C-alpha cells in the first residue's frame, strides 16, 4: 500500500484512517467514519466494518458476508459528494461515490450512496444508506465533471 490513505484524503494513511482501523482512535465525524469504512473495504478489515456498523444492523452472518466480498472486489477510489453534519446532532449524512471493479467484470462500477450515521456515546456508527436518483444531465457523482449520461450511467451498481 502506498503511504497515502486509500480514502483519497491526500493525507498519509498513518495520519488519516489507520488509527481508526487499528482501534486506537474513534472517528470524530461521520465523514471520517465513512472514509475509514471505505479504507476498511480496501484493506479487508472486517473487524472495523463490523465494529462501526450500528449494533441493530449487525447480523450473525455479517462477518462471513463481508469476507466473501473481499477477494472479488478491487476498490479504486472514493469521492465524497457532501456531508451534512452538525456537532450538536446525533445523526449525520454523507453522500459518496466509490469506484470499484468486480474481478469477473469488464468495466468499472460505481456505488453512489447517501449514508446515514448515528452517534452513540461519542462514537459514530453506520446505520443505513440509500442510492440517490441521479438525472442523466446531472454532474456525474464519480467527480469527473462530466454529465452522468456521458460518464457512469451504465456502470452504476
Curated annotation (Swiss-Prot):
Domain of life, source organism: Bacteria
InterPro entries: NTF2-like_dom_sf (IPR032710), SEC_C_motif (IPR004027), UPF0225 (IPR023006), YchJ-like_M (IPR048469)
Gene3D superfamilies on file: 3.10.450.50
One Pfam family per UniProt: SEC-C
Alphabetized PANTHER family for the sequence: ADENYLATE CYCLASE-ASSOCIATED CAP C-TERMINAL DOMAIN-CONTAINING PROTEIN (PTHR33747:SF1), UPF0225 PROTEIN SCO1677 (PTHR33747)
NCBIfam families on file: PRK01617.1, PRK01752.1
Family indicated by similarity: Belongs to the UPF0225 family.
Protein name (database record): UPF0225 protein PMI1492
Species of the source: Proteus mirabilis (strain HI4320)
Lineage: Bacteria, Pseudomonadati, Pseudomonadota, Gammaproteobacteria, Enterobacterales
Amino acid at each position: 500500500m502506498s503511504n497515502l490513505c486509500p480514502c483519497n484524503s491526500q493525507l498519509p494513511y498513518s495520519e488519516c484512517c489507520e488509527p481508526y482501523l487499528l482501534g486506537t482512535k474513534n472517528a470524530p465525524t461521520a465523514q471520517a467514519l465513512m472514509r475509514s469504512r471505505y479504507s476498511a473495504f480496501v484493506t479487508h478489515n472486517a473487524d472495523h466494518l463490523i465494529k462501526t456498523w450500528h449494533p441493530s444492523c449487525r447480523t450473525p452472518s455479517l462477518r462471513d458476508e463481508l469476507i466473501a466480498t473481499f477477494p472479488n472486489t478491487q476498490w479504486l477510489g472514493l469521492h465524497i459528494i457532501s456531508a451534512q453534519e452538525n456537532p450538536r446532532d446525533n445523526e449525520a449524512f454523507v453522500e459518496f461515490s466509490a469506484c470499484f471493479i468486480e474481478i469477473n467484470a469488464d468495466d468499472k462500477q460505481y456505488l453512489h450512496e447517501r449514508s446515514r450515521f448515528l452517534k452513540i456515546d461519542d462514537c459514530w456508527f453506520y446505520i443505513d444508506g440509500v442510492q440517490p436518483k441521479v438525472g442523466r444531465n446531472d454532474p456525474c457523482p464519480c467527480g469527473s465533471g462530466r454529465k452522468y449520461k456521458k460518464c457512469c450511467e451504465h456502470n452504476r451498481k
